[in-house]
Design a protein with these regions (language model features):
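Solvent-exposed alpha-helices and their adjacent loops that cap or buttress functional pockets
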Residues: 60-62, 100-104, 161-165, 179-181, ...
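Active-site loop/lid in soluble adenylation, ligation, and acyl-transfer enzymes
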Residues: 1-85, 95, 245-248
Length: 261
């Protein structure tokens, strides 16, 4: 192997991105053509695979949390993909059911939404919530039942949080899959959720997956953002994620649950 080839091989081991693919004549090696086809199929599957809401509910309930399963106004996947606006609104019967279940005001509502990758929420939602629970306990925050929604967009959390009288809502949603990331989970935090909030009023934690941000790291960031959001009364472009500064401070490693002092 030549020096440039060896360099590309070493770089390729550090990222799932499609780099250093090599050549076979004027085209790509057969191995890379097959890998591309597999990645494309995995991305399509991530978008079109139905979310197993009941299975997710069981995994969340195993953590000791109550759940509610709801639906958006998109009746099926085809409509959801063609009409994003339907995915941002609760079905009337789901809105009524949540309203009946709403209790006293809470600090946080959590919505698990399939988004564009059911695989991401199947694999990542419960581990993220489990990693976040020690932060919840330490801060003394009270939670609404975890809501699970099919055919859902980020903005559906605004209605959910408003109905449940939450000071903030965190939407755990499957992100649009790429050719190397069909399993990426995103977290969108919004203070004062209500219909009509814009994306500029949200904070996003992206790329939560085995090859990206770990559940523990994502939970740490969410804890920092939520604490600051509740203190300052805002989220979005006016709230910058400075959790890394806190983590770099002396003794900050103890802020990660399970970290040794």
């Amino acid at each position: 192997m030549s020096a440039p080839d060896d360099l590309w091989a070493r770089l390729a081991r550090l990222t799932p991105a499609r780099i250093g693919l090599g050549r076979a004549g004027s085209g790509l090696p057969t191995r890379e053509v097959l890998r591309f086809g597999l990645a494309h199929a995995q991305a399509r599957d991530a978008v079109h695979t139905p979310m197993e809401a009941e299975a997710i509910a069981r995994s969340v309930e195993a953590l000791g949390l109550a759940t509610r399963v709801v639906a958006s106004q998109a009746p099926d996947r085809a409509t959801y993909l063609r009409r994003p606006d339907y995915g941002r609104r609760l079905a009337p019967e789901s809105a009524d059911a949540l309203a009946r279940a709403a209790g006293a005001p809470v600090d946080l509502a959590i919505l698990i939404a399939d988004g564009l990758s059911a695989r991401a929420v199947h694999e990542g939602a419960a581990p993220l919530i489990a990693a976040f629970q020690p932060h919840i306990a330490a801060a003394g925050w009270n939670l609404a039942p975890v809501v699970i929604a099919a055919q859902a967009r980020v903005a559906l959390g605004d209605a959910v949080g408003s109905i449940l009288r939450a000071r903030a809502v965190a939407v755990l949603i499957g992100e649009r899959p790429g050719l190397s990331s069909p399993d990426s989970l995103g977290i969108y935090l919004t203070f004062g959720p209500r219909p009509g909030r814009s994306d500029a009023e949200r904070n996003c934690i992206s790329n939560v997956r085995p090859a990206g941000l770990s559940p523990a790291e994502a939970a740490f960031k969410l804890n920092w953002l939520l604490r600051e959001a509740l203190s300052r009364g805002l989220t979005g472009v006016n709230l910058k994620d400075e959790s890394e500064r806190f983590l770099a401070a002396p003794g900050a490693a103890r802020a990660l649950p399970g970290a040794e002092s």
